[in-house]
Amino acid sequence: EKKLNKLLMKAIDEAETNEDKARLLSVCWESGLDFANDFMYFVRYALDDDFIVSMEAFTVAENIEELKEEQLTEAILFIDQNSKSNSVAAEQLKTFIRSKIN
């Protein structure tokens, strides 16, 4: 399973178009694979300028279970440091992450 995760992520990184990236991201959440160790990877793509890429990555992140509090805290810090001001996607992502923190 881990090899398949890495293969999918490599394909996303190497995709030539945003449309291809979005399709591959949708495969990640539709596959039911466990991407818990790769949460930050999808957080980064959830901040992408392309709406569809961002939405698909957000969906993957949203469907990851068993996240550690450290991962969630790291994600919020990353979003704060790397999102454009007033980014709706960033605010929605932070709201989701905060809801997962116990």
Regions found by a protein language model. Give the residues of each.
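Amphipathic alpha-helical scaffolding segments comprising HEAT/armadillo-like alpha-solenoid repeats
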Residues: 1-12, 33-47, 69-79
